Design a protein with these regions (language model features):
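Vicinal oxygen chelate
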Residues: 2-9, 41, 62-91
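Core segments of cupin and vicinal oxygen chelate
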Residues: 7-57, 95-102, 107-112
Length: 113
């Protein structure tokens, strides 16, 4: 199980809010990277999704692990995508996708790919 994931979005606050709603958790600011938010699932593992402003790159930086670097222009689309299991009905997921993201149903035969 993956308990931590980082993605970029044009509107990190909105994206984190939608993810938090779907996960039954809450979205909070992520101070290490200004303008970022953390969608917390509020489970026993501390699972969540960090949402950075589009154009943010995380570069290796020795002992601290990494440094956030904002590129001068947003790249538009990226290759990051993931499947997230939530205890939310399909209609609510569909409504959330209408707020700017995308969603599609997944079947058991599709899982793990």
């Amino acid at each position: 199980m993956i308990h931590h994931l980082s993605i970029a979005a044009r509107d990190p606050k909105q994206a984190a809010g939608v993810l938090a709603e779907l996960m039954g958790g809450k979205a909070v600011p992520f101070p290490p990277n200004p303008g970022s938010f953390f969608a917390l699932q509020l489970d026993e593992h501390g699972s969540g999704v960090e949402v950075y402003p589009a154009g943010t790159e995380l570069e290796p930086n020795g002992d601290v692990g990494g440094t956030f670097v904002k590129q001068p222009r947003e790249r538009g689309y990226g290759s990051t995508h993931f499947a997230l299991s939530v205890l939310t009905d399909a209609q609510k997921v569909g409504r959330s996708a209408m707020s700017g993201g995308s969603a599609r149903p997944s079947s058991q035969s599709n899982s793990g790919r």
